[in-house]
Curated annotation (Swiss-Prot):
Record keywords: ATP-binding, DNA-binding, Metal-binding, Nucleotide-binding, Repressor, Transcription, Transcription regulation, Zinc, Zinc-finger
Occurrences of domain ATP-cone (ranges): 49-139
Protein encoded by which gene: nrdR
Residue ranges covered by zinc fingers (unnamed): 3-34
Protein name, as recorded: Transcriptional repressor NrdR
Biological process, per Gene Ontology: negative regulation of DNA-templated transcription
Cofactor: Zn(2+)
Keyword rRNA-binding: no
Entry GO MF terms: ATP binding; DNA binding; zinc ion binding
Length: 147
């Protein structure tokens, strides 16, 4: 596998772990040129449900977009990248287990909110305030009461 740091084509696997559910394999790799380490995740190639947006348009589910929105909500919070990746994997598993061909973007947002609530309450509030488009302070108060 190509090293993401220097582009060298030779890397060695130094550690391999199978997830608790045996749904994916996590591998730590080390570049033989620059000696830097990086993590890769190996999982089956599957078809996620198509996301139906609020305006009715459809788009492929993109894990990267979900991860980026979670990272933004979790910015400067004490949550590890591994915890975020595990939460993202749980979201993906729920989408696949649903058996649906299409899913509303609101359902995806709710899945993200559930995972953020487990990881970090502040990140949950950050995400919810944008996702639900809060208009006033009372909506924040209600959300905080629900936590």
């Amino acid at each position: 596998m190509k090293c993401p740091f220097c582009g060298h084509l030779e890397t060695q696997v130094v550690e391999t772990r199978v997830s608790e559910d045996a749904d994916f394999v996590r591998r730590r790799r080390q570049c033989s040129a620059c000696d830097k380490r990086f993590t890769t995740y190996e999982r089956p190639d599957v078809n996620f449900p198509v996301v139906v947006k609020k305006d009715g348009s459809r788009a492929d589910f993109e894990s990267g977009k979900v991860r980026a929105s979670m990272m933004l909500a979790l910015r400067k919070r004490p949550v590890s990248i591994e915890q975020i990746d595990n939460a993202l994997l749980r979201i993906e598993q729920k989408l696949l287990a649903s058996g649906l061909r299409e899913i509303d973007s609101t359902k995806v947002g709710e899945l993200v909110m559930r995972e953020l609530k487990k990881l970090d309450k502040v990140a949950y509030v950050r995400f919810a305030s944008v996702y639900r488009s809060f208009e006033d302070v009372d909506e924040f108060r209600q959300l905080l009461r629900d936590i």
